[in-house]
Regions:
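C-terminal catalytic "cap/lid" subdomain
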Residues: 1-274
Length: 274
């Protein structure tokens, strides 16, 4: 029987902080921590922003070196704090395992298989993997050159800079039953300017029909929640990839409890094949 992981979930940076207070939102960490259990893989952004806030609080000013250097330095500082808070709130009877990934861990078959083994063993060993992109050691120009070289060899190359993509790629690798993308809105809207147009379900009987529906919705997707984010259009692209591989996809607001989103008892968008 094929091994499967129950859930791959992802939460974005801005959902983990209180911008008005320049601080971490500990309530979010608490809610998530109490809901996470073995059989789940949690992809968490937040290291860079949390590192920035921590540096600002300790020194009274932000770093003023180059963009790549700032991202590297903030991410290195924030990752430790990110993991500290997950460990603080996850049930102490469960192990917590940090997994930092880059694109080559999914584009190289041997490295991909190595990660698959790590994730499946975690479920068996009562451990919860917390995954993030390894920003402190990822240099933009080198990464671009590596990706260009890979794309010359084959078409199906993943970048995984966006943790929505990272979550979708992991969901495919571990044959996840559900992919949950937590974001700053309730889901996908027919009209992004009108909250009443939330689309509760995007489904079809065939892969071709589902892809057609998603492509139509992508035409109305504009903007993103913050600079550097890829927005709803990219989120739909990654969700489609998972749905076509047989994973049930849920996109919903991070303010809701994880279990309520999984039960679809709160506003959200569900994507999948009938």
């Amino acid at each position: 029987m094929q091994q499967r992981i129950d859930l791959v979930g992802k939460i974005g940076s801005m959902a983990l902080i209180r911008p008005e207070d320049h601080d971490i939102d500990y309530n979010i960490f608490s809610r998530l921590g109490h809901a996470l259990r073995p059989g789940m893989i949690w992809v968490s952004s937040g290291a860079t922003e949390i590192g920035r806030l921590d540096y600002l609080r300790r020194h009274g000013h932000e770093l003023d070196n180059g963009i790549d250097e700032m991202k590297t330095d903030y991410a290195a500082q924030g990752q430790a704090i990110l993991m500290e808070n997950y460990r603080r709130f996850i049930d102490p009877k469960y192990s917590v395992r940090q997994v930092l990934v880059e694109h080559q861990h999914f584009n190289d078959p041997e490295k991909r298989a190595h990660l698959q083994g790590l994730f499946f063993r975690a479920a068996e060993q009562d451990a919860i993997p917390i995954v993030n992109y390894n920003d402190p050691v990822s240099f933009t120009e080198n990464r671009k050159m590596e990706l260009i070289a890979l794309k010359k060899q084959h078409e199906d190359v993943v970048e995984c800079i966006d943790n929505d993509e990272t979550a979708a790629v992991i969901a495919e690798a571990v044959h996840a039953r559900t992919l949950l993308l937590m974001t700053g809105v309730d889901g996908i809207y027919a009209d992004p300017q009108d909250p009443s147009t939330l689309i509760r379900e995007i489904s079809a009987k065939t892969p071709e029909a589902l892809e057609k529906k998603v492509r139509e919705l992508q035409k109305s997707c504009v903007g993103a929640s913050r600079p550097g984010a890829n927005g709803a259009k990219a989120k739909l692209e990654y969700a489609l990839r998972s749905a076509l591989s047989g994973t049930h996809v849920i996109i919903g607001h991070a303010k809701h409890h994880l279990n309520d989103l999984l039960a679809e008892s709160v506003p959200c968008t569900v994507i999948g094949l009938d």
